C-alpha cells in the first residue's frame, strides 16, 4: 500500500509562540542547550494505489497546510 509522510511547518519568518513556550520549558527542565523549537504537524497518508507526488502536493496545499503561513515537505513513507 503506497504511503506518504507530509510534514507541515510554519514558515521560518512566522512567529511560533508554541515553539517558544516549549523551548522555555526545556530550559526550565535543565536542557539549557535547547536554543529554539519549531512546532509542526505530521501526516501519514496511505493510498489504495500509487499516486504522483504532484497529486499529493495538491492534497497538502489544499487541505493540510495554510500556504500563507505554512510550508510542507513530502517524503515517501
Describe each model-derived feature in a short phrase:
Residues 1-77:
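Non-catalytic terminal accessory/regulatory regions of metabolic enzymes
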Amino acid at each position: 500500500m503506497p504511503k506518504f509522510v507530509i510534514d507541515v511547518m510554519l514558515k521560518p519568518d512566522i512567529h511560533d509562540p508554541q515553539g517558544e513556550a516549549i523551548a522555555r520549558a526545556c530550559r526550565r527542565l535543565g536542557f539549557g542547550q535547547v536554543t529554539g523549537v519549531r512546532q509542526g504537524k505530521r501526516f501519514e497518508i496511505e493510498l489504495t494505489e500509487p499516486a504522483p507526488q504532484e497529486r499529493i502536493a495538491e492534497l497538502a496545499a489544499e487541505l493540510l497546510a495554510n500556504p500563507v503561513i505554512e510550508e510542507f515537505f513530502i517524503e515517501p513513507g
